[in-house]
């Protein structure tokens, strides 16, 4: 496989740019420690409900039984006949709504 001088030069320049960006991130981490890490900030945020986010998300995805739209999560926001179902408009939504 033959590579042109231009493609090799561009590959070297892009590789160096990636190394520079990684080095800048590493410097920031070494200076500020975990306090500069976004994940650390997200972990320290208070949770408004009694359940942690992962538990709420798992309950939302795994539990399809509902009594009202408030029991359904964002992926399946509509409660029909005791089950959380996606809200789909148009012809497909009409067919799915008729079946359920």
Curated annotation (Swiss-Prot):
Keyword tags: Calcium channel impairing toxin, Disulfide bond, Ion channel impairing toxin, Knottin, Neurotoxin, Secreted, Signal, Toxin, Voltage-gated calcium channel impairing toxin
GO cellular component, one term: extracellular region
PROSITE patterns linked: OMEGA_ACTX_2
GO molecular function: calcium channel regulator activity; sodium channel inhibitor activity; toxin activity
Subcellular location: Secreted
Disulfide partners: 60-73, 66-79, 72-84
Chain residues in the propeptide: 24-55
Source taxon at top rank: Eukaryota
Tissues in which the UniProt entry reports expression: Expressed by the venom gland.
Keyword presence, Repressor: no
Cleavable signal peptide: 1-23
Pfam family, one: Toxin_23
InterPro entries, A to Z: Omega_atracotoxin_CS2 (IPR013139), Toxin_23 (IPR012628)
Family: Belongs to the neurotoxin 15 family. 02 (omega-actx) subfamily.
Role summary: Potent inhibitor of insect, but not mammalian, voltage-gated calcium channels (Cav).
Record remark: domains: The presence of a 'disulfide through disulfide knot' structurally defines this protein as a knottin.
Protein name (database record): Omega-hexatoxin-Asp2b
Organism: Atrax sp. (strain Illawarra)
């Amino acid at each position: 496989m033959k590579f042109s001088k231009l493609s090799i030069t561009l590959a070297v320049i892009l590789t160096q740019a990636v190394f520079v960006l990684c080095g800048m991130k590493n410097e920031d981490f070494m200076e500020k420690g975990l306090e500069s890490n976004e994940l650390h900030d997200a972990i320290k945020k208070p949770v408004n409900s009694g359940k942690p986010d992962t538990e709420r998300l798992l309950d939302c995805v795994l539990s399809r039984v509902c009594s009202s739209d408030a029991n359904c999560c964002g992926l399946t926001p509509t409660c029909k006949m005791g089950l959380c179902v996606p809200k789909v408009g148009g012809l497909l939504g009409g067919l799915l709504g008729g079946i359920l």
